[in-house]
Amino acid sequence: MLDAFSRSVVSADAKTAAVGAGDIAALRQYVAEGNKRLDAVNAITSNASCIVSDAVTGMICENTGLIQAGGNCYPNRRMAACLRDGEIILRYISYALLAGDASVLDDRCLNGLKETYIALGVPAQSAARAVAIMKASATAHIGETNTQANGGAKFRKMETTQGDCSALVAEAASYFDRVISAIA
């Protein structure tokens, strides 16, 4: 996994040249947006437990057979494994968002995930649906579109840097889409 700074150095080194003005301008922009990026990651990690449990609950509500005898969320140990997997996926998405690079997600989370789920008999459609629900929740937290009306008793207002976060919302959404594509 290379962060934005390391990528610039590696690229310049491969060309046997100094870091160029275009790279420096891109790094300045990256630093300027740094607080928003940190706030976005904080919004995900501070709400990770709720994001994951709500996603698994939503997946089960749409497919109640998952919690019946023989279902992939029955008995409790399988439910715990499902919640654990959701937390791991969300954690690697937060790493990718922090670094601004999907390689950590690809290398350490998605590589072989589909094959593992197939071997374990995990229904790909249900797993992808849970990730889609996590995507909706996480992007709402990042974009501050989560409101008291939507969250009810679970609503929690986060202190965040002011400004447009639409680029970070789109970036985070792309990481969730990578996971969905890898599973499906």
From Swiss-Prot:
The modification N4-methylasparagine is found at residue 72. Contains three covalently linked bilin chromophores. Its main location: membrane. The keyword Repeat does not apply. It comes from the Bacteria. (2R,3E)-phycoerythrobilin 3 binds at residue 165. GO terms for cellular component: phycobilisome; plasma membrane-derived thylakoid membrane. It holds the Pfam family Phycobilisome. Signal peptide: none annotated. GO terms for biological process: photosynthesis. (2R,3E)-phycoerythrobilin 2 binds at residue 82. It is found in: Cellular thylakoid membrane. Transmembrane segments: none annotated. Keywords: Antenna complex, Bile pigment, Chromophore, Electron transport, Membrane, Methylation, Photosynthesis, Phycobilisome, Thylakoid, Transport. It is a peripheral membrane protein. (2R,3E)-phycoerythrobilin 1 binds at residues 50, 61. Light-harvesting photosynthetic bile pigment-protein from the phycobiliprotein complex. Belongs to the phycobiliprotein family. Heterodimer of an alpha and a beta chain. This is C-phycoerythrin class 1 subunit beta. It comes from Synechococcus sp. (strain WH7803). The lineage of its organism: Bacteria, Bacillati, Cyanobacteriota, Cyanophyceae, Synechococcales.
